[in-house]
């Protein structure tokens, strides 16, 4: 099977490439350092599996990239690499096209099993995070009302500028510098956006922005 590895740390890309290329049934055909490059590599190489880090640099979110790649290249199975810090994103990543996720510090044997599992079209879930995923599913199962709202009727022009930047992972200071406003202004707008849209977390905001097509690479 052909595999693309996307991670912003070169040492991780190199390490995983060595492990996978040692397998008779696996070949790493390309690597990528961010979400944008991952999309380009998948488009070029048409891999069977994309092994992708969820934590990407601002502007190139792993969640955003997952959604776009899954929509454009459904034949490529996406396996997410994650750390415990990313737990709140897991439900949203799986709902937006990933076939599974695995912890970065998982044993090599578990990584290989996860890759072969998603390659077959099955879902792989790291058992250490299953409880978090179930809890997130329960809390979100009846919480889709915000997704039906029209952002162009609810949000102000400035809020429509800020929302995509938040979703892409930019911090308050970076957004303030981009829009030439104060950090306090950005914080106030962020609060208003979450309140107006009925959102409770950043992953929900990212998913909302994706569904409303407010994000582009």
Swiss-Prot record:
InterPro entries to which the protein is assigned, alphabetical: CheY-like_superfamily, Sig_transdc_resp-reg_C-effctor, Sig_transdc_resp-reg_receiver, Tscrpt_reg_LuxR_C, WalR-like
A GO cellular component entry from the record: cytoplasm
Cellular compartment(s): Cytoplasm
Residue ranges occupied by any HTH luxR-type domain in the UniProt entry: 148-213
Major site of localization recorded for this protein: cytoplasm
PROSITE patterns assigned to the protein according to its UniProt record, in alphabetical order: HTH_LUXR_1, HTH_LUXR_2, RESPONSE_REGULATORY
Name of protein: Oxygen regulatory protein NreC
Lineage, top ranks: Bacteria, Bacillati, Bacillota, Bacilli, Bacillales
């Amino acid at each position: 099977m052909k595999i693309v590895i996307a991670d912003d740390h070169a040492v991780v890309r190199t390490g995983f490439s060595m492990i996978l290329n040692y397998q008779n049934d696996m070949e790493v055909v390309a690597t990528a350092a961010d979400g944008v490059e991952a999309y380009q590599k998948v488009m070029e190489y048409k891999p069977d599996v994309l092994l992708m880090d969820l934590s990407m640099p601002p502007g190139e979110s792993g969640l955003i990239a997952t959604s776009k790649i899954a929509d454009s290249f459904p034949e490529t199975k996406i396996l997410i690499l994650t750390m415990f810090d990313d737990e709140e994103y897991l439900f949203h990543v799986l709902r937006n096209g990933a076939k599974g996720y695995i912890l970065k510090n998982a044993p090599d044997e578990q990584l290989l099993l996860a890759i072969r599992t998603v390659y077959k079209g099955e879902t792989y879930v790291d058992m250490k995070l299953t409880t978090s995923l179930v809890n997130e599913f329960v809390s979100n199962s009846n919480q889709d009302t915000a997704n039906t709202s029209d952002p162009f009727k609810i949000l102000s022009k400035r809020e429509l500028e800020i929302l995509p930047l938040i979703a892409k992972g930019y911090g308050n200071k970076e957004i303030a510098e981009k829009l030439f406003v104060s950090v306090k202004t950005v914080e106030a707008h962020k609060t208003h956006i979450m309140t107006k849209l009925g959102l409770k977390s950043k992953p929900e905001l990212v998913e909302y922005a994706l569904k409303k097509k407010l994000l582009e690479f």
